[in-house]
Amino acid sequence: MARVKRGNIARKRRNKILNLAKGFIGGNKNLFRTANQRVMKALCNAYRDRRRRKRDFRRLWISRINASARINGTNYSKLINGMKNAEIIINRKMLAQLALNDPKCFEKIVSSVSN
């Protein structure tokens, strides 16, 4: 039976991990075992944070909308409820952009909702 040599396969597997570990500090980029641990941790963090990013941005938009709504004499809850009743369909991202970049337009939306 022929002898099985796995040097190439093992090297490719290790190099794949070490390439993912580029930019890490110290032995975390050079030593396979620590690099492997760091890469696994980094991939777990990336997976978790891709989901967390969606929550964080929604929280940021709501905070911005609430701050601008309070400047205009209402609050976030009343503004969103009024928009639903008035059938004004603008998502929170766009509403936050309006509040930040075009306060006069945001003020018109608030006044149309509060009437």
From Swiss-Prot:
Alphabetized UniProt keyword annotations: Ribonucleoprotein, Ribosomal protein, RNA-binding, rRNA-binding
Superkingdom field: Bacteria
Record InterPro entries: Ribosomal_bL20, RIBOSOMAL_L20_CS, Ribosomal_protein_bL20_C
GO molecular function: rRNA binding; structural constituent of ribosome
Keyword Ribonucleoprotein: yes
Gene3D superfamilies found in the cross-reference section: 6.10.160.10, Ribosomal protein L20 (1.10.1900.20)
Biological process according to GO: ribosomal large subunit assembly; translation
NCBIfam families per UniProt: rplT_bact (TIGR01032)
Function: Binds directly to 23S ribosomal RNA and is necessary for the in vitro assembly process of the 50S ribosomal subunit. It is not involved in the protein synthesizing functions of that subunit.
Cross-referenced HAMAP family: Ribosomal_bL20
Name recorded for this polypeptide: Large ribosomal subunit protein bL20
Species this chain originates from: Prochlorococcus marinus (strain MIT 9301)
Gene that this sequence comes from: rplT
